[in-house]
A protein has these predicted regions:
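Carbohydrate transferase catalytic cores enriched for Leloir-type hexosyltransferases
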Residues: 1-372
């Protein structure tokens, strides 16, 4: 098959949507090399991570000479897909071009409907644009991929997408999270980032929906002799300032460690050295940091809402994300129970096999083949 991909997020996004795009294309190249992969992007972002990604793959990149690059991605790409004899075009992050050619089969991945569930966090104009793009893509796609049963449920309830048109295909995480860092690597990483000996870990964007402030408030309520430092890997703007103001006002600077910029290759060791991974998000399409933690052998505390129980499995610890008291109790009780933590991480490592790279990639290839 000649498979085309919307690769803008692959080259320019280094969190959830970009990771999904890179992992799928990388896995297709590794496990199904007989297929020809075509990456369509208005331009390429020249960074260490994109260079490493491109040098490791067999692929073709297609760009436009049109100065209106966003116009090409939304309206002008169709004729290029026909020219390149693309069999399947996959919109990896919610979008398919308008004027899509009938000669080409189409798949779109919908990660979440966050802007519909939390409209107060988005500008009115942005919501209208997103809704137009999402509904158009769901309408014209030959198949809609939802990354969780929770997202499938939202698509049916909010956009009335026919259930039979939706396929739930989970995502995997990068292979490096399954590789155990040796003691020397862990210690070098600890020194490099000035990490405490024992710590709690949060990885993700620092935005309101991710709920970092409630973690900090819960830690603040724990008696000082039981408090464990929190390492935060991620960046943010206004909400991050709000969190940092709370930390400053309550004298918690020595307990909360922010790592805004890290080398991606160091992230597995940071997960592996953590006592617990904490992710009490209010809503996720899937929650890839949860399976990164499980693959790394780190026990997880996460929310009992949206897709997070799908990602965390039966042996992660679940809390009401709005209950600071529940989170406080978990952060007090779990670190003190080493036997339970050991059971959690062993069962978590077994559960995360559900998201095996080859398995989920095979499911996607089978979906592509079913459309031809």
């Amino acid at each position: 098959m000649n498979i085309g991909f919307d690769a803008k997020r692959l080259f320019f996004n280094f969190t959830g949507l970009g990771n999904y795009s890179r992992d799928l294309v990388r896995n297709l190249n590794a496990f199904f090399p007989e297929h020809s992969l075509h990456l369509y992007s208005p331009k390429i972002n020249d960074t260490d991570r994109t260079r490493e990604f491109l040098y490791s793959l067999t692929y073709q990149v297609h760009r436009t000479k049109n100065p209106l690059k966003s116009y090409w991605r939304t309206f002008g790409m169709g004729k290029d897909l026909v020219r390149d004899q693309i069999d399947i075009y996959h919109g990896l992050s919610h979008e398919l071009p308008f004027n899509f050619p009938k000669e080409v089969k189409s798949v779109v991945t919908i990660h979440d409907l966050i802007f519909e569930k939390f409209p107060q966090q988005y500008a009115w104009a942005d919501r209208q644009i997103y809704r137009k793009k999402f509904t158009h893509s769901c309408e014209i796609a030959d198949r809609v991929v939802a990354i969780s049963e929770a997202t499938k449920k939202d698509l049916i309830e909010i956009y009335q997408v026919p259930e039979e048109k939706i396929s739930v295909i989970y995502q995997s995480c990068a292979e490096i999270f399954y590789e155990k860092a040796d003691e020397e690597t862990q210690e070098k990483t600890r020194i490099k980032y000035k990490l405490p000996k024992d710590y709690l870990l949060y990885v993700g964007s620092i935005i309101e929906r991710k709920n970092l402030l409630n973690i900090v408030k819960a830690i603040h309520l724990i008696p000082p002799d039981q408090q464990m430092p929190l390492v935060v890997v991620g960046e943010g703007k206004k909400y991050a300032d709000k969190v940092k103001n709370y930390i400053h006002q309550n004298g918690l600077e020595n307990l909360i460690h922010f790592l805004a910029q890290i080398d991606f290759a160091d992230l597995p060791a940071i997960y592996q050295m953590a006592t617990l991974f904490i992710y009490p998000s209010l809503y996720e399409g899937f929650g890839i940091p949860v399976i990164e933690a499980l693959a790394s052998g780190t026990p997880v505390i996460t929310s009992s809402v949206s897709s997070l129980p799908e990602a965390g499995g039966p042996d992660s610890h679940y809390v009401d994300p709005n209950s600071i008291e529940e989170l406080k109790k978990a952060l007090e009780d779990l670190p003190a129970n080493q036997a339970h933590l050991t059971s959690m991480y062993k069962k978590g490592e077994d559960y995360v096999k559900k998201f095996d790279r080859e398995k989920v990639t095979r499911e996607m290839v089978e979906l592509y083949e079913s459309l031809l």
